[in-house]
Curated annotation (Swiss-Prot):
This is Dual oxidase maturation factor 1. Disulfide bonds: none annotated. The gene is Duoxa1. InterPro entries: Dual_oxidase_maturation_fac. Residues 1-24, 73-183, 227-249 are extracellular.
C-alpha cells in the first residue's frame, strides 16, 4: 500500500483541472489575439485617426467577445452556501463544505469544496458539469454520476434538475436557455453585419445594426428572466442550510453590453442627422466619398459624379465631353457617327 501512496488501487487519484471553462478560454484567446494583432499595426496609422481607430477596435471586439462568452457561460444564475452535510451514501459522517451552483444556458455546474479541503482522509474538491444542450442528455450524465459515486451534495443538486424531478427546474431552465441562446446568436450576426457596414460608406445602417445587436441581447435577458420566473419555489436544502440562487455575472454583463450597443446606435443615428461630417471623420471616411443613391424621377441609380454636381450649391463647369455625351444620349438620331467625339 505504501507503493500506492496510501491510496486504494480501485480509487483514481485527483485529476488536474483547468482553472476555467475551456470554451471560454478559447473565445478569450481568439479575441485577445485579434486585439494584439490590431495593436501591432497601430503605429502605421497617423494623426488622431489612430486614437479613433483603436477605440473602435476595442469596443467592437469587446462586444463580440461578450456575446460569445456569455452564450457558453454557466453563470447566468448562481448560488453559494456553506453547509454541514453528509458526504457519502450509507455513511453517518458529516463534513463542512462550500457548495456552489452555477446555471447556464446549456446546463448546470456544481462545485463542492471542503473547509478544510482535507477531510475524512480525502480531498474534497469537486467541479461537476451536467449539460442539456442539443445533442446532450442530462439524464444520461446524471446516471453516470450515480455510477461514479459522487458525493451526496452534488447528487442531490443534480437530481433537482433531472427531467423527472417534481421541481420542474429542468424544463424551465432548458427552455429559457434555448430561447436566450438563439437570441444571442442573432445578436452576434447583427454584430458582424454592423462591423461590415461601419467599414463602408453606410454608417447609419451600421448604427441600426448596433441597435439590433443591443435589442436582441435584451430579448435574451427577457426570455431567460420570464421563463425562470415561472418556476415555483423549490427549496435546495443541504443539511441545515438552504441554497438560494440569483442572477449571475453573465446576466449583468449581457445587460450592460446590450445597453451599450443601444446607446452607441442612438448616438450614431443622432450624429448622422446633426453632424454627419464629424461622424465620417471618426470612422476615417471622407465626406466626398461617392455614394450611389436612387434617382427620384426615373427610379434609377444616380452616378456619384452627377449626384455631387446636383447637390453642390455652386455652379460647376461641365466638361465638353460629358455635355456632348449627354446631348447625344437625349437626341434620337439614326446615325451613331454624329455623336462620336
Amino acid at each position: 500500500m505504501a507503493a500506492l501512496g496510501h491510496t486504494l488501487p480501485f480509487y483514481t487519484g485527483t485529476k488536474p483541472t483547468f482553472p476555467m471553462d475551456t470554451t471560454l478560454a478559447v473565445i478569450i484567446t481568439i479575441f485577445l489575439t485579434a486585439l494584439v494583432t490590431f495593436i501591432i499595426i497601430l503605429p502605421g496609422i497617423r494623426g488622431k485617426t489612430r486614437l479613433f481607430w483603436l477605440l473602435r477596435v476595442v469596443t467592437s471586439l469587446f462586444i463580440g467577445a461578450v456575446i460569445l462568452a456569455v452564450n457558453f457561460s454557466s453563470e447566468w444564475s448562481v448560488g453559494h452556501v456553506n453547509a454541514n452535510t453528509t458526504y457519502k451514501a450509507f455513511s453517518p459522517k458529516w463534513v463542512s463544505v462550500d457548495v456552489g451552483l452555477q446555471i447556464g444556458l446549456g446546463g448546470v455546474n456544481i462545485t463542492l469544496t471542503g473547509t478544510p479541503v482535507q477531510q475524512l482522509n480525502e480531498t474534497i474538491n469537486y467541479n461537476e458539469a451536467f449539460a442539456w444542450r442539443l445533442g446532450r442528455s442530462y439524464a444520461e450524465e446524471y446516471a453516470k454520476a450515480l455510477e461514479k459515486g459522487l458525493p451526496d451534495p452534488v447528487l442531490y443538486l443534480a437530481e433537482k434538475f433531472t427531467p423527472r424531478s417534481p421541481c420542474g427546474l429542468y424544463n424551465q431552465y432548458r427552455l429559457a436557455g434555448h430561447y436566450a441562446s438563439a437570441m444571442l446568436w442573432v445578436a452576434f450576426l447583427c454584430w458582424l453585419l454592423a462591423n461590415v457596414m461601419l467599414s463602408m460608406p453606410v454608417l447609419v445602417y451600421g448604427g441600426h445594426m448596433l441597435l439590433a445587436t443591443g435589442l436582441f441581447q435584451l430579448l435574451a435577458l427577457f426570455f431567460f428572466s420570464m421563463t425562470t420566473s415561472l418556476i415555483s419555489p423549490c427549496p435546495l436544502r443541504l443539511g441545515t442550510a438552504v441554497l438560494h440562487t440569483h442572477h449571475g455575472p453573465a446576466f449583468w454583463i449581457t445587460l450592460a453590453t446590450g445597453l451599450l450597443c443601444i446607446l452607441l446606435g442612438l448616438v450614431m443615428a443622432v450624429a448622422h442627422r446633426m453632424q454627419p461630417h464629424r461622424l465620417k471623420a471618426f470612422f476615417n471616411q471622407s465626406s466626398e466619398d461617392p455614394v450611389l443613391e436612387w434617382g427620384s424621377e426615373e427610379g434609377g441609380l444616380l452616378s456619384p459624379h452627377y449626384r455631387s454636381i446636383a447637390e453642390s450649391p455652386e455652379t460647376q463647369d461641365i466638361p465638353m465631353s460629358v455635355a456632348s455625351s449627354e446631348t447625344c444620349f437625349k437626341e434620337e438620331h439614326p446615325k451613331e457617327s454624329d455623336c462620336s467625339l
